[in-house]
Amino acid sequence: INDSYKQRVTSNRDMVCLISDIHYGIKTTNAISPYDSDVCKQKMDYLINKTIAFSLENDVDKLYLMILGDEISGLIHNTTRLEQREDVVSQVIEVSELLYESIVKLAKNLPFVVVGLAQGNHSRVMADKKDSLEQENFTRLIKEFLKLRLANISNVLLLENKFDESIIELNIRGYNVIGLHGQNDRLNNLSRLIEMFDKKIDYICLGHYHQSKEFENNKTEVIVNGCFSGD
């Protein structure tokens, strides 16, 4: 789509964009923040346009897009299922297409895009986590869909997770960055997570908590992304 990166004079600037907790398929009708699949698409379009504008304004070499789980509303809560506008199969198909279209739009406008996905709790196949295997997660289907659709786009790299499917590992300009959903981690006790790695972790990016915040934990900067669905 965009081969300009091959002849590009580097600016030594990279950018990270976080997406999490889309909860595609759920419908809420509260007056402050109504949400359904149409609103989701509008929000995604707004985010992608703002990302492109900021990247171009700052002459960014490479965009790292970290998709931090809960792309779909899923099956895990029966009350949530009753609020869903689409069945879970439709959720997977439609959010996969939405993410694909968003990545293509980024690729058309930016030199290079790196995409990583981490699976969350809403995308597990079984409602009860005790009955669910780690690898039985709808995010694997979303990732496979993206892999097939993006295969011939030369300036997009879809990452394979080194540790497991729940953790994205990046090295950005010498900084070690990990991204994950966060359902198994408490914000006030991230030491165990940090100690899992045999290197210094400079940044941890999380979803799950639905409220954006940023703080430091043992010299590691922790960035918690807000909830895409706004609930």
Per-range role (PLM):
Residues 60, 152-157:
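Short glycine-aromatic motifs
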Residues 136-140, 147-152, 161-164, 173-231:
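Conserved beta-sheet core of the metallophosphoesterase superfamily
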Residues 20-22, 69-72, 119-123, 182-184, ...:
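Active-site metal-binding loops of divalent metal-dependent hydrolases
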Residues 23-28:
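Metal-dependent catalytic core segments for phosphate chemistry
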Residues 116, 156-157, 164:
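Domain-scale recognition of functional cores that engage charged ligands
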Residues 3-19, 30-148:
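Core catalytic region of metal-dependent phosphoesterases/phosphodiesterases
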Residues 167:
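Short, solvent-exposed loop/turn elements at beta->coil junctions and helix N-caps
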